[in-house]
Amino acid sequence: MATVNQLVRKPRAPKVDKTNVPALNACPQKRGVCTRVYTTTPKKPNSALRKVARVRLTNGFEVTSYIGGEGHNLQEHSVILIRGGRVKDLPGVRYHTVRGALDCAGVSSRRQGRSKYGAKRPKS
């Protein structure tokens, strides 16, 4: 236990929480420009071609963002919005593309869980 005098001279250092999404700078989302749109394969034991984009953010960070949903319209120079949220079977992918925002279209055929994919309510 430190004495009062020791604490006066050198106070206790606060605990620093490490963030899982450093490129967001404590913001809920960030805008960026796609520098490369490609597919990559997941870790074992999964098998697929996952759609991802390399994104240059407005704060200068360059990150990899996952493009969720079936089909997308992204290409190089598309302006997109990214949010936090990693993809467990893709190493190094810590961000998700927000569907239905900026240049990224929503998933057109979506009927359930539409809000996560930027899909409008279908005309019944």
From Swiss-Prot:
Keywords: Methylation, Ribonucleoprotein, Ribosomal protein, RNA-binding, rRNA-binding, tRNA-binding. The modification 3-methylthioaspartic acid is found at D89. The keyword Transferase does not apply. GO terms for biological process: translation. Gene3D superfamilies: Nucleic acid-binding proteins. The keyword Glycosyltransferase does not apply. It comes from the Bacteria. GO terms for molecular function: rRNA binding; structural constituent of ribosome; tRNA binding. InterPro entries: NA-bd_OB-fold (IPR012340), Ribosomal_uS12 (IPR006032), Ribosomal_uS12_bac (IPR005679). GO terms for cellular component: small ribosomal subunit. With S4 and S5 plays an important role in translational accuracy. Part of the 30S ribosomal subunit. Contacts proteins S8 and S17. May interact with IF1 in the 30S initiation complex. Belongs to the universal ribosomal protein uS12 family. This is Small ribosomal subunit protein uS12. It comes from Shewanella sp. (strain W3-18-1). The lineage of its organism: Bacteria, Pseudomonadati, Pseudomonadota, Gammaproteobacteria, Alteromonadales.
